[in-house]
């Protein structure tokens, strides 16, 4: 089983992430940021990743540190669970619609952090959640998972729908990329022989 548990403790946050890449999509999420929990649940359900995240952060200031550090810790756990990446498909992609909204996510588990994030939300907040924090979440994930990630919201009017299509597509792209391919066996999917 490809599993990992990582804890990150700073003066701003205390976060523990446990995940199983070969799970069934169950989640237990308690970040203290309800809309973030809702989006993390999309990753679990659509990625078939069992995800347990507990976070305590300086929410009396705002959600920035909690959201960013959750992305960082999730990225660290993801990298640890993938280990040497032998036999994985490596690349994943997904288009996901939700009513009027449509997003595309493409990922390469390359070992090289890179983020292209092209999302123009139709409003700055979803409830009391600042949508700018999603960029911080994905930047934290990418830098600590060592992946290249392209996120494009192609259209959308409802900001909630825009965010949800992004996270659903992210989960589905992850699911595709981490799948093992029996034809690869123990081969690393790179001409360099390592990722």
From Swiss-Prot:
This is Imidazoleglycerol-phosphate dehydratase. Pathway: Amino-acid biosynthesis; L-histidine biosynthesis; L-histidine from 5-phospho-alpha-D-ribose 1-diphosphate: step 6/9. The keyword Zinc-finger does not apply. HAMAP family: HisB (MF_00076). Keywords: Amino-acid biosynthesis, Cytoplasm, Histidine biosynthesis, Lyase. One of its GO terms (biological process) is L-histidine biosynthetic process. NCBIfam families: PRK00951.1-1 (NF002106), PRK00951.1-5 (NF002109), PRK00951.2-1 (NF002111), PRK00951.2-4 (NF002114). InterPro entries: IGPD_sf, ImidazoleglycerolP_deHydtase, ImidazoleglycerP_deHydtase_CS, Ribosomal_Su5_D2-typ_SF. SUPFAM superfamilies: Ribosomal protein S5 domain 2-like (SSF54211). Belongs to the imidazoleglycerol-phosphate dehydratase family. Pfam families: IGPD (PF00475). The gene is hisB. CDD domains: IGPD. Gene3D superfamilies: Imidazole glycerol phosphate dehydratase, domain 1 (3.30.230.40). GO terms for cellular component: cytoplasm. It is found in: Cytoplasm. GO terms for molecular function: imidazoleglycerol-phosphate dehydratase activity. It catalyses: D-erythro-1-(imidazol-4-yl)glycerol 3-phosphate = 3-(imidazol-4-yl)-2-oxopropyl phosphate + H2O. Its EC number is 4.2.1.19.
